[in-house]
Amino acid sequence: MVSSDRPVSLEDEVSHSMKEMIGGCCVCSDERGWAENPLVYCDGHGCSVAVHQACYGIVQVPTGPWFCRKCESQERAARVRCELCPHKDGALKRTDNGGWAHVVCALYIPEVQFANVSTMEPIVLQSVPHDRYNKTCYICDEQGRESKAATGACMTCNKHGCRQAFHVTCAQFAGLLCEEEGNGADNVQYCGYCKYHFSKLKKSKRGSNRSYEQSLSDSSSHSQDKHHEKEKKKYKEKDKHKQKHKKQPEPSPALVPSLTVTTEKTYTSTSNNSISGSLKRLEDTAARFTNANFQEVSAHTSSGKDVSEARGSEGKGKKSSAHSSGQRGRKPGAGRNPGTAVSASSPFPQGSFSGTPGSVKSSSGSSVQSPQDFLSFTDSDLRSDSYTHTQQPSSTKDVHKGESGSQEAAVNSFSSLVGHPVTSTVISQPKSFDNSPGELGSSSLPTAGYKRAQTSGIEEEAVKEKKRKGNKQSKHGPGRPKGNKNQENVSHLSVSSASPTSSVASAAGSVTSSSLQKSPTLLRNGSLQSLSVGSSPVGSEISMQYRHDGACPTTTFSELLNAIHNGIYNSNDVAVSFPNVVSGSGSSTPVSSSHIPQQSSGHLQQVGALSPSAASSVTPAAATTQANTVSGSSLSQAPAHMYGSRLNQNPSMAVLIAQSESSQTDQDLGDNARSLGGRGSSPRGSLSPRSPVSNLQLRYDQPSNSSLETVPPVAASIEQLLERQWSEGQQFLLEQGTPGDILGMLKSLHQLQVENRRLEEQIKNLTAKKERLQLLNAQLSVPFPAITTNPSPSHQMHTYTAQTAPPPDSLNSSKSPHIGNSFLPDNSLPVLNQDLTSSGQSTSSSSALSTPPPAGQSPAQQSSGVSGVQQVNGVTVGALASGMQTVTSTIPAVSAVGGIIGALPGNQLAINGIVGALNGVIQTPVTISQNPAPLTHTSVPPNAAHPMPAAALTNSASGLGLLSDQQRQMFIQQQQFQQLLNSQQLTPEQHQAFLYQLMQQQHHPPELQQLQLPGPTQIPINNLLAGAQAPPLHTATTNPFLTIHGDSTSQKVTRLSDKTGPVAQEKS
């Protein structure tokens, strides 16, 4: 069940233990609801929980029934008990250990956290120190509940040095919980005090408020007696307000607004006041809404000072903003300026300029609404430490009968009487701003000036006539306006005669609107001018109103433009950047063109220009007062061109002047011939920092004896303006950055750091991999060294005797202690099916060839020589065919073998000695046998050589003279190959010689291809070397064998399986 306003009878429905709660919400105790933060009631049977959406972390309020977490869990009520306090009822949520805890307990015990700050669950209790569970609640002791005093965890009094401990819910029932302004982005801290310190804090707060309000008025002319008189008059005002509400359900355009409005104070807290700005009551406040802070006006006209004082004894002050979410760290309103003075309301009845009853609601730091809209709630971000100033429409006819002739500088809230004088609201970022139909709200400016009396009703009738002519109505219906969320911040200029003027930033997050400068100004001759911009579906207009000696001329914005266009203002002095004042409806601006009213005294003008996108019915305006002929005193406000509007030094008014050509004359000249000429500097209008707003700057005079005196400019150069903009932009961002956002940014930063580290590691690994591959590529790209053969026949020839066709399993499972030093590890001789099928009768046997390097060879020579032998590992010889016409040689270049051979001691093969002399014999000491039984090897005499036909040598003798030594050696070896192939009676020794010489020829394919041998002794070398290209790097593919097919009567075949797979695996 959702309610935007709490029914009065709800307290009767609350269970007995919760009846002591002061408000409706079980978390914040506020009994009010808002459209964006409604009060939601649990529909569970017998459950009386009522919470705000933001207080309980409800992401979306359902349209149907809603159940609290306790009712939703359907757990027995006896089992649901808060782990932090002895109370069972209230708004409970699950904890991380499966128990339950109150949301309010989680908020007020500092160590308790929410795992998810948006849903506010689960409640994490693991950080709560044990000491809190050992404390006893003094409230339970006082009320005779000693058995429950030690239950749960207790919070302590926030007064330094006080050791009183109490349960959060006990303090909530007793009204001892409050909120204090935090430092920095932590805008609100949740505090609780014991009864003694809470009462002391309340008293000191009351006194500090009183002193601060007096400091806003003329401190030299007030006495305490007048203070009490004005308080009494204020109560009379309230009664008249009640009658006024009954008489006026609808605002009327003919209403005469009185310039002086009573500002009703409940709690005025300002951040300039160290004590008064701190205490905020939790029970009646609404400071925990995350999305926006909603300005809300009391729904009853009786909520005046008497009510607030009666409630003040119980510690129930009203606060002017709605709930910020109850999250830790995001508890405050979404952007409060802690450093701006916002409270300008006073407990005094304000003087009226006219004796005619008028109804104006002027807000200085709070938003007030029209009578018919009084029960709905405005949504303004005025969270700048101000409690609700409920401005009641005043009928101030008999206020100052006895003081009509006196000049008393009281704190006046002047409304910038534009349009309907019913609502004067200050908006900054309204999410839902409810204005009644026909309202044109105008924000007001708390100023200190003389109260003027004895103004005749004729003047008021003139004001009525001017109002009817010059002002347009805003026709937004109740509910949210169509305007942008980012609307104008209206800067309030508080001017007092003896105290420094504080330009009050009325909007949270409006850093551009507050800048404290000395301006000891008073209203001269009681004249006040207020320039405001109204935005309505019909159009926008700026209305300037003067109260000067009984005349109330009204100047519209077009007159201002015409005056600027006609040269009344210096083009250098009037810097206007006002691209579009017309509201979002798009209709043209019906502004009237007239002359600038002539005033005998210079006036400070300030224009609050509404955002083009803000079609809200509320008119931000800043009424400014005339400086009291003090040359050199200036009112400065921060530049409002932070987010979109810029300081334009050239008058770019062509568009607006074109719009104002068709406007009408609205008024006559004033009394005197002094024009509103612009010299010196002027306050810049405070515009919204979030919308592309226009910035209108008007310069003004400080006249003395009808002569112009130039006021020194606030910023002498554009550099100073930019520097101020930069610093204030930083301040704005700091103030806008709520702790939840900072927490989210820190989490994102942490995630980015983790991801960055992971990517750096990945890059490091990939770089190392790339370097390894580059090294391997460099090793493999080294050309094979030339194989030098020993021509001397003085070597003993060792040859293997061929093993006669051992079965494949004996080949694959042969275990020899010497195999570890060879290229043939166990199980590394697979027999390919295609070779078995292609040569059906061929049998396979393997020869393990390993030639240790000579003793005198250095390791460098060993490693360099190894690369030439890589192909030994992959050469496989099949059956020799009888015809030998189809000799296909695929001797693979095995990659990555050289690195293994160089790295493994004992596996280093030397090139020297592999290929013998020209007779083709192989010299190699037999060190490794494939079978456990040693192989029988025969010694061939060194001079033993295969016979070479002389015809072959003579046939090729003619080509030998043209060849180099290396080519000659290869040629002779080729001749030997042909001799061997022609004989077709190969012994196992010849098989070995043939194998090695084929391997040697593969190292030099280009030279072999260039050999052109005459005669029939030539062998198809290209066929022998087909498929001898090197495989790609780091890929171990099974290479095809050098298969030489024979018929069924062919000789026994020696066949060596491919080793590239195991070798590459060992390399990787």
Curated annotation (Swiss-Prot):
Residues 752-780 are annotated as: Leucine-zipper. The modification Phosphoserine is found at residues 217, 252, 436, 532, 686, 688, 691. The lineage of its organism: Eukaryota, Metazoa, Chordata, Craniata, Vertebrata. This is Protein AF-10. Residues 296-305, 340-351, 387-396, 404-416, 428-446, 595-604, 787-816, 1040-1054 have a biased composition (Polar residues). GO terms for biological process: positive regulation of transcription by RNA polymerase II. A zinc finger (PHD-type) spans 22-74, 135-198. Residues 352-372, 490-506, 583-594, 681-692, 836-850, 857-869 have a biased composition (Low complexity). The gene is Mllt10. There is a cross-link at residue 280 (Glycyl lysine isopeptide (Lys-Gly) (interchain with G-Cter in SUMO2)). GO terms for cellular component: nucleoplasm; nucleus; protein-containing complex. GO terms for molecular function: chromatin binding; histone binding; nucleosome binding; zinc ion binding. Probably involved in transcriptional regulation. Binds to cruciform DNA. In cells, binding to unmodified histone H3 regulates DOT1L functions including histone H3 'Lys-79' dimethylation (H3K79me2) and gene activation.
